[in-house]
Amino acid sequence: MSSVTWAPGNYPSTRRSDHVDTYQSASKGEVPVPDPYQWLEESTDEVDKWTTAQADLAQSYLDQNADIQKLAEKFRASRNYAKFSAPTLLDDGHWYWFYNRGLQSQSVLYRSKEPALPDFSKGDDNVGDVFFDPNVLAADGSAGMVLCKFSPDGKFFAYAVSHLGGDYSTIYVRSTSSPLSQASVAQGVDGRLSDEVKWFKFSTIIWTKDSKGFLYQRYPARERHEGTRSDRNAMMCYHKVGTTQEEDIIVYQDNEHPEWIYGADTSEDGKYLYLYQFKDTSKKNLLWVAELDEDGVKSGIHWRKVVNEYAADYNIITNHGSLVYIKTNLNAPQYKVITIDLSKDEPEIRDFIPEEKDAKLAQVNCANEEYFVAIYKRNVKDEIYLYSKAGVQLTRLAPDFVGAASIANRQKQTHFFLTLSGFNTPGTIARYDFTAPETQRFSILRTTKVNELDPDDFESTQVWYESKDGTKIPMFIVRHKSTKFDGTAAAIQYGYGGFATSADPFFSPIILTFLQTYGAIFAVPSIRGGGEFGEEWHKGGRRETKVNTFDDFIAAAQFLVKNKYAAPGKVAINGASNGGLLVMGSIVRAPEGTFGAAVPEGGVADLLKFHKFTGGQAWISEYGNPSIPEEFDYIYPLSPVHNVRTDKVMPATLITVNIGDGRVVPMHSFKFIATLQHNVPQNPHPLLIKIDKSWLGHGMGKPTDKNVKDAADKWGFIARALGLELKTVE
């Protein structure tokens, strides 16, 4: 164990103001709520000096831990293996796929040398050429490609570039005859077109069938790409290739609802333009449809309001003529597929693939024009099925697979690909070919090979435990096979629990390296608020039932100790974004000694003010509105920053945040650490905040070196807090 000294109370001075906000409570009337750290919401010289002092303290503590450098070396080695995506055949006659040699900060987009599906056993560089290398966008790794889409005819490539991980990005366009590689940059050739589409955020790129342009969502120009003011006045626009952004058509904007955001899609045959409207992050949206003629997208579009009330989630799958197939949770919390015939004045909704009561329909794609590939999530394990054009289930694919799956295909092609991964499955690409003999249609295209780890040395199991209110909760437990369940191991417990997002099995060489190095286990409970069991599971952990999310997470740790999966006091918890709220709320609510360490990353801590910054107003559907008295009464007791006790020993805590996070603004983390340090200044365990003052984003897109350092700091802190000895399990 690395020797690290800690002197309680050695924190930077944090000014406390007499600022008080007043809220209305349905049960108590007017409630004054002190906010002594309200000044940390601003961007001032005082805040800058405070963040520097806090960051320096955290770094000085981490620098004492010699294990961190050793972990960084191990993590870097464990990440050094080839990674790849499923290939896609475009209309230019080439296959395209992403490939990463191992430690590249961003995967490189390759293009096949020949029209045939590449034989990847010969090596990616032998069967393909670099088409687009995002690593050359900025020498220091500060620019990243966050999204890309090819035009339907395969002639254009549109890609969005973000700087320092920020949510705002700019779309550029290039011809597919103009690759971007290390070689082209060395020759001083960029090759992109003049198109420059700015202020792109929370959207995708939707090409029209004629390949003349694309739709996208943008926000009004602002002085700074990131900031804390609310996101408002989004607009869905159409950009024609070869024109300026000033010439773009505003396809839709609702000035009466400036907080709403939009999505769009076009039908495979180019006949329909679909517009989605969202008022928040709830699984409910409007669906409008417009018919396009030979002139394509133009001003003054006439919209048919097919769904004009926020009652359910609607997501277009495809259309066969005027018959549109939609994945929805309308009267089906586990989701189903319906059809609507747009040729009728009063479209009738018909079930196509009915809801399954014990499995959530997670993804549906149309394949080979008339078949449907569906992924169901049953007990947090993905199952893949093929359906006929009549909605009849034909077969199950990869029945022995346990993990998470995704589908990649183009509707008109006679094949589709599946990406399969799990806690100890680094990644397999499978192909289904409709033209092959039936017994040969499903095959493995390529499998990820990990260099420094043997995935077969690890195993994952699923257990069920009882939460505080008696609800049964599933939880995955991952371990190196040499680690015993005898009550001596440390446990890393990870969670999210919000926004109907499922905590699916995922492969992490860093986590497996930590488990192997320290003989620990990794636990992922499927807590309420997530989407593992459909919308009812989500509703069981949002707004007035949000307390269940924390109770489920705390009960998971107690179960691990009681059943000898973990040692008492050696459960460390980790989560990011909404998962950061989960971690902060759990250490505040749990009995003393439940957790040995906590690392909340970029989390929400002030539940009385979250809706006043950037996109936070969209989260009211998840957390509630503190301005409404009845909702204030259940929000206030859950808000982490307002419920830190002064008489309770807190676990070793390392909060991590990026100074320019434009999604969950850093004031949440700032206020929470200031409150912890003030309320329990003599806490025997460190209460620290690591602030990355060079990064804008919410945590995504960091260069490899920065990611490895962050991981080593986090896991090294946890190892020290739990008193773990660095070792290697043979």
UniProtKB/Swiss-Prot annotation:
Residue spans crossing the bilayer: none
Example GO biological process: proteolysis
PROSITE patterns from the UniProt entry: PRO_ENDOPEP_SER
UniProt GO molecular function: oligopeptidase activity; serine-type endopeptidase activity
Top-rank taxon, per record: Eukaryota
Active site (record annotation): S577, D661, H698
GO cellular component terms listed in the entry, alphabetical order: cytosol
EC number per UniProt: 3.4.21.26
Substrates-to-products reaction catalysed: Hydrolysis of Pro-|-Xaa >> Ala-|-Xaa in oligopeptides
Family membership noted in the UniProt record: Belongs to the peptidase S9A family.
Function: Dual function macrocyclase-peptidase involved in the biosynthesis of the highly toxic amanitin toxin family of macrocycles. Cleaves peptide bonds on the C-terminal side of prolyl residues. The enzyme first removes 10 residues from the N-terminus of a 35-residue substrate. Conformational trapping of the 25 amino-acid peptide forces the enzyme to release this intermediate rather than proceed to macrocyclization. The enzyme rebinds the 25 amino-acid peptide in a different conformation and catalyzes macrocyclization of the N-terminal eight residues.
Subunit-structure text: Monomer.
PANTHER family: PROLYL ENDOPEPTIDASE
Protein name as catalogued: Dual function macrocyclase-peptidase POPB
Gene: POPB
